[in-house]
């Protein structure tokens, strides 16, 4: 059992090292995309399923409240938090539309959709991205594996942050770290510390 625990830590560290080599440019571009949208008076909509929903919710909470620094709240909405809306849409046999309907109702040109999907194939996330495209929104996609169907929907202005792993647990861990990096970059770009 101890060897298995050590193997989990080792694999996680190896994934972090690979991601540290592969992802800084994409994370930087994503952060600047989010910052520019906020500076233009727009908002960030975010969505995911399961652990990805938790990561989306963490991002929105860190924008609205704060990440590590006291600052004014920033407009972000986690689309997976309103159970009444989600179940109303799903109850009409539109489970694949639970996020897309919200994107069409709340999203505007200049807003950003932060779409989080471990494999990039979740139908409701794919539909949300398709809806965001029709609303002239920019997409920041956090994926893994081969990027799935989601990767093929992205345009030149969009950013994919694809975790270099084929293990869901490692991808989800790195999505959380990536969300924290994005929050840190947004805070330090919009509200630079005097002592930095």
Swiss-Prot record:
SUPFAM superfamilies registered for this protein in UniProt: SIS domain (SSF53697)
Superkingdom of origin = Bacteria
A GO BP annotation: carbohydrate derivative metabolic process
Print the keywords alphabetically: DNA replication
PROSITE patterns in UniProt: SIS
GO terms (molecular function) for this protein are: carbohydrate derivative binding
Query: Signal peptide span per the entry?
Result: none
Mind telling me which Pfam families this protein's record contains?
A: SIS_2
Q: Which residues cross the membrane?
A: none
Start and end of every SIS domain?
A: 34-196
Matching entries from HAMAP family are given as: SIS_DiaA (MF_01157)
Q: How does it assemble?
A: Homotetramer; dimer of dimers.
Provide the function of this protein.
Answer: Required for the timely initiation of chromosomal replication via direct interactions with the DnaA initiator protein.
Family membership, please give it. Answer: Belongs to the SIS family. DiaA subfamily.
| Name recorded for this polypeptide | DnaA initiator-associating protein DiaA
Question: Per the UniProt entry, what species is this protein from, by scientific name?
Answer: Klebsiella pneumoniae subsp. pneumoniae (strain ATCC 700721 / MGH 78578)
Q: Which gene encodes it?
A: diaA
